[in-house]
Regions:
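Cys-dependent protein tyrosine phosphatase-like superfamily
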Residues: 2-215, 228-328
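Ser/Thr-glycine-rich phosphate-binding loops at phosphate-binding pockets of nucleotides
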Residues: 219-225
Length: 328
């Protein structure tokens, strides 16, 4: 079997592919394959039972912890206390390449990670870098529980001297138009000089990490992380519609969080129940928010390539290195 002759360290990505599934309901032969992709961009396919594929994937991961496993396409990680932690792996670029799974993980705060969550991130996803987009005040209140051997980068996206205000105070300041407030907030994330420098630093860190997976996160993983993810995916050549779909995945992930915040808000500010609509604007992403980002990039900066080069200082050489590092 050819699999026996492939050095494990030469394998970059392995996943199961199922062929023959028929949505019409008619019986059809279903074949499971183990798909292996090597550092030389060679692709191999092995006909196996589903159990054999799963056994091989587990063994390969033990032999090579850096190996990317699975075909997540932006799906949520199976974690207990982190509802919006997602793997950007397997998202496809415009030229047909894929992001390597288990390398780029977007998330909300990881302060509430359970022991089981920490084990999964450390052992199964081989997390070696954490990038924290939150303010110093947010970090002080809920610091990340950094795992052994993990490098931590604090890159606050918003200028703390100007951001101020607690979460509930921001809700109260919306004056019944939370969506307008959020669109302006998104606009500031890619026009404010301080925020742009921080996003540029984020891309630079991604470019220079040595090995393992990177978790980058804010508080809920929607806004600062959502914009950062969009900029990263643009830099990797992922099409706009794919970026929009990934962005909108935060809503089902945060349904329970929104319910909890509604209860908390009612208890804290019972006299302002009419503000609950504005609270929803904070805890749900909307296409109009990310479209604001797209419009600023395209209409005010001459397109994404010009924006990446002039605003985020991503040179053509750095762009190619980033793609080489995370795409296959």
């Amino acid at each position: 079997m050819m699999l026996n002759s492939l050095p494990c360290k030469d394998i970059l990505w392995a996943y199961m592919r199922r062929e023959g599934a028929d949505k019409t309901g008619e019986k059809q032969l279903i074949i499971n394959y183990l798909v292996i992709i090597t550092r030389r961009q060679k692709r191999y396919k092995f006909d196996m039972t589903e159990q054999e594929v799963q056994d091989c994937l587990r063994l390969l991961k033990v032999l090579n912890p850096d190996l990317a496993v699975g075909f997540p396409k932006g799906s949520r990680l199976p974690l207990q206390n982190l509802p919006n932690t997602r793997d950007l792996g397997a998202l496809m670029t415009e030229d047909g390449l894929h992001i390597l799974p288990r390398k780029l993980l977007r998330s909300g705060e990881i302060y509430h990670a359970s022991i089981a969550d920490t084990r999964i991130l450390s052992e199964e996803y081989n997390v070696k870098t954490v990038i924290d987009f939150r303010s110093a005040a947010e970090v002080k209140k809920k610091p990340d529980d950094i795992m052994a051997g993990v490098e931590y980068y604090h890159i606050p996206i918003r200028d703390e001297e100007r951001s101020g205000n607690s979460f509930f105070e921001r809700v109260m300041s919306c004056y019944g138009d939370g969506e307008r407030y959020m669109r302006e907030r998104y606009r500031s994330l890619i026009t404010d000089e301080y925020s742009l420098k921080q996003y540029a630093r984020f891309l630079d860190v991604l470019l220079h990490v040595k090995n393992g997976a990177v978790v980058f996160h804010s508080t809920t993983g929607e806004d600062r992380t959502g914009v950062g993810t969009a900029l990263l995916l643009f830099a990797l050549g992922v099409p706009k519609e794919t970026i929009r779909r990934d962005y909108m995945r935060s809503n089902p992930c945060l349904e329970e969080e929104l319910k909890y915040m509604r209860r908390l808000y009612r208890a804290d500010r019972p006299e302002n129940s009419r503000k609950l609509a504005d609270l929803k604007a904070f805890y749900q992403v909307k296409e109009s928010y990310i479209n604001t980002v797209f419009d600023v990039i395209e209409k005010e900066n001459g397109g994404i390539e010009r924006f990446l080069r002039r605003k985020l200082y991503l040179t053509p050489k750095a762009s190619e290195e980033l793609k080489k590092k995370y795409l296959i």
